[in-house]
Amino acid sequence: MATSEEPSTDASIICYAPSMITTNGVWQGDNPLDFSLPLFVLQLTLVVVVTRFFVFILKPFRQPRVISEILGGIVLGPSVLGRSTKFAHTIFPQRSVMVLETMANVGLLYFLFLVGVEMDIMVVRKTGKRALTIAIGGMVLPFLIGAAFSFSMHRSEDHLGQGTYILFLGVALSVTAFPVLARILAELKLINTEIGRISMSAALVNDMFAWILLALAIALAESDKTSFASLWVMISSAVFIAVCVFVVRPGIAWIIRKTPEGENFSEFHICLILTGVMISGFITDAIGTHSVFGAFVFGLVIPNGPLGLTLIEKLEDFVSGLLLPLFFAISGLKTNIAAIQGPATWLTLFLVIFLACAGKVIGTVIVAFFHGMPVREGITLGLLLNTKGLVEMIVLNVGKDQKVLDDETFATMVLVALVMTGVITPIVTILYKPVKKSVSYKRRTIQQTKPDSELRVLVCVHTPRNVPTIINLLEASHPTKRSPICIYVLHLVELTGRASAMLIVHNTRKSGRPALNRTQAQSDHIINAFENYEQHAAFVAVQPLTAISPYSTMHEDVCSLAEDKRVSFIIIPFHKQQTVDGGMESTNPAYRLVNQNLLENSPCSVGILVDRGLNGATRLNSNTVSLQVAVLFFGGPDDREALAYAWRMAQHPGITLTVLRFIHDEDEADTASTRATNDSDLKIPKMDHRKQRQLDDDYINLFRAENAEYESIVYIEKLVSNGEETVAAVRSMDSSHDLFIVGRGEGMSSPLTAGLTDWSECPELGAIGDLLASSDFAATVSVLVVQQYVGSWAQEDDMDFPESPVHSHETKVTYGLENPR
């Protein structure tokens, strides 16, 4: 037990009871908090809960998770809750700090190992002169400012020299946190911009310099007894790095070669590597460098590829979500804001924040100016490089442990890191607004696209499972020399707190290097599939892209890209997939949110693809494509857009198209679509329904006239009285087709679909689309639900209908009129 529960000083003596680890239980009269294990479990739970609370509170402000973790530590420490003596002595007694700090450092050890695994040294080598000079320019001035302030903050009675103090403050102020910066860039949707790429590359270079300076600072701090100790520390560190590069790396490469491709690595090899992390930490700690340095270097020598991916997947969530917050909690327990006393000290704090931030901005602006960048972009770049995070906290904690930094300086620098990182997102949001070019183009629908012009399609993909059906659908879209297809493939990646998801920005696929993480591996698989399609198909151009966003705002990236690229049609997968027994199950409910938001905000037409086996019906070779396609036409702009797309597909020699138009058999007035009852909830303008009926008739007549000679195109009119007869008619043809193309029918109400919406599970598909996609539908038929761009409706009145596409084969059209009664 502890003989002293006062705040730690050099004279404190803490006594431990080694056998008091687990309790006999409260029924035996034991207090669980007197024993190490239950106390640690309570502390860990409290740290995670408080940290997650701040993550939830700060999420609307788009703050990185490191802010929440530092705030959680400060709240639990002597600055807030720790001011209560009872709380401090009960929850965080000094006798428990050793266990807590040991576990925190174990978590830190493995986290830095993962950072090393994910970091690609080749990217640093290929950053270019601009990123390198920007990184150096952004480090020099803050380092000099830290050195200048060290003279006023360093106490003459401290046992360590001024040089060591300068080094610690300089490193703390000049570093940039690469993982935190990646998160901020993704939140601000700058990660794929030029300024995002430059700042990420500069941050990587900065990170490498920071590790070198950190090793030097630790060596100087831990070797004050003899002047040659620092030299031996540096030599030993160099030898350790050489052993890792020339001995450990080849050994791990041998393990990778011995493991057959596609098979899992053995448990023995994984445990061997995880043990190697601890051994590396022990060695570097023993030679006078911090243990995290050894873990980081050990991670760097792990070859990129499946082994690195396996290690990341096994460790990252546990280490980042559970153990790493302990490190920030320890930092918070060491942070006593009350130690910052007097107006002069607070003035120094604000001066350090302002001048350090200004120094990095000025240094970056000067270098950026010489590279021809606008001043506003240089300022934004400088602000982004002010991001602080884990490396700075390591520097500060080492400085505190080595008595280089006193309580006042430590608390000051923690607040500096907190404020400098916290203000970046709002300031950059206000200051830097990328110039959005006003894009004005008329061909926002397939119906408006001329048959002799390029069709631009944006394909959204969540997982590789979406790829085969989409590729087959695109091949069926019949790209020709006269009307080629330009495909923008957008891999949609959720923005998470995991660093590995961020590193996809530095995709090294083109250099032939393997994927760094599962996200990049999936992206590579998707892109390779589409590029393979491009190579084997004629008149197709593919451009792969990646969007990293929260699902709540992912549609903004899709809409922005569609407008920038002047896209006419967006294809996005349905949120449900087919199961083995033929049913439909949801893969990720967030996909549905993306689809709904996209339908509401899209700048062009949208198609939601329900995949129920289309991938088994076609091949990449256009000569072997064979599809039976059906269009169910009820009327309205969405149905006309569906027919326009099917019309294009019908020109493919392997496509047979059936157009089934449903007509009410009582009164022509009833066939006109009427407004839905909830007018206020609909986004579409009030339409002249007779005009819409006229547009339907005109387009159908044009379609029939242009295709009268082609027997692969069948047109049928079916008279029905109500929704029940409509369902019966649809079910009668479900087994003879591979793909249904239907309009969503947004804002339209018809007696032909009366009652169908009452049982609708997915309103975003419309009444007919929901029926076809439901698990109750007998056949495994894929469905494409089309919504025409809203703004095109007003233009249709004055629009000439497009010429019919050029046909390459002579066939004959079949007409029919059916009454089911």
Curated annotation (Swiss-Prot):
Compartments, as annotated in UniProt: Membrane
Region feature Disordered, mapped onto this chain: 800-821
Predominant place of localization: membrane
Membrane topology: Multi-pass membrane protein
Gene Ontology biological process terms in this record: potassium ion transport; proton transmembrane transport; regulation of pH
GO cellular component, one term: membrane
Tissue: Specifically expressed in pollen.
Pfam entry (one): CHX17_2nd
Residue intervals passing through the bilayer: 37-57, 65-82, 97-117, 131-151, 166-186, 200-220, 228-248, 268-288, 292-312, 318-338, 350-370, 378-398, 410-430
Top-level taxonomic group: Eukaryota
Disulfide-bonded cysteines: none
Gene Ontology terms, MF aspect: antiporter activity
Membrane as UniProt keyword: yes
InterPro entries: Cation/H_exchanger_TM, CPA2_transporter, Na+/solute_symporter_sf
UniProt keyword list: Antiport, Ion transport, Membrane, Potassium, Potassium transport, Transmembrane, Transmembrane helix, Transport
Reported function: May operate as a cation/H(+) antiporter.
Family: Belongs to the monovalent cation:proton antiporter 2 (CPA2) transporter (TC 2.A.37) family. CHX (TC 2.A.37.4) subfamily.
PANTHER family per record: CATION/H + ANTIPORTER (PTHR32468), CATION_H(+) ANTIPORTER 15 (PTHR32468:SF26)
Name this polypeptide is given: Cation/H(+) antiporter 15
Organism: Arabidopsis thaliana
